[in-house]
Regions:
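Mixed-charge (Asp/Glu-Lys/Arg
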Residues: 1-33, 38-139
Length: 139
């Protein structure tokens, strides 16, 4: 599977999960450098989401985990890491991301990022930290 297909699968899984949770979701019609989706609970205010997808965990020093590297772009409000084999999501504020991370896929790992396992709630309005600027309708 090529990286474009893998990335598209991750984006669609995140989009479906957000819709199930009641979020408004918008997808840019062209590739935007810095984010893949816009999502929010109000149709007029969105978070910019960068989606990163890993297909299977890899072994490193006797343990297995999903490895994400070369994380350079910081134009989004949140990164969502998709662990395909575990069907798991980590919703992480961009300012909490290092250049590379390892995730267990089930929230049990040692990384500080593990606390963001399944943390969809941080995208809701009660979580005012990391809120993006308002995106207004074109009407």
């Amino acid at each position: 599977m090529n990286t474009t297909t893998l990335g598209t699968i991750g984006e669609r899984l995140v989009e479906a999960e957000l819709l199930k949770l009641g979020f408004c979701v918008a997808r840019p019609s062209v590739d935007i450098d810095g984010y893949d989706l816009l999502a929010g609970t109000d149709a007029r205010e969105y978070h910019r989401l960068q989606i990163k997808t890993c297909r299977i965990p890899v072994e490193h020093k006797g343990s297995y985990g999903y490895r994400y590297t070369a994380i350079k772009n910081r134009k989004s409000d949140f990164f969502i890491f998709v662990c395909l084999m575990h069907n798991a999501f980590y919703i992480v504020p961009t300012d909490q991301i290092a250049a590379s991370i390892r995730l267990s896929g089930d929230g049990s790992g040692q990384s500080e990022i593990e606390k963001f396992f399944g943390a969809w709630h941080i995208l809701k309005p009660t979580s005012t930290d990391h809120a993006s600027a308002q995106v207004l309708d074109a009407q």
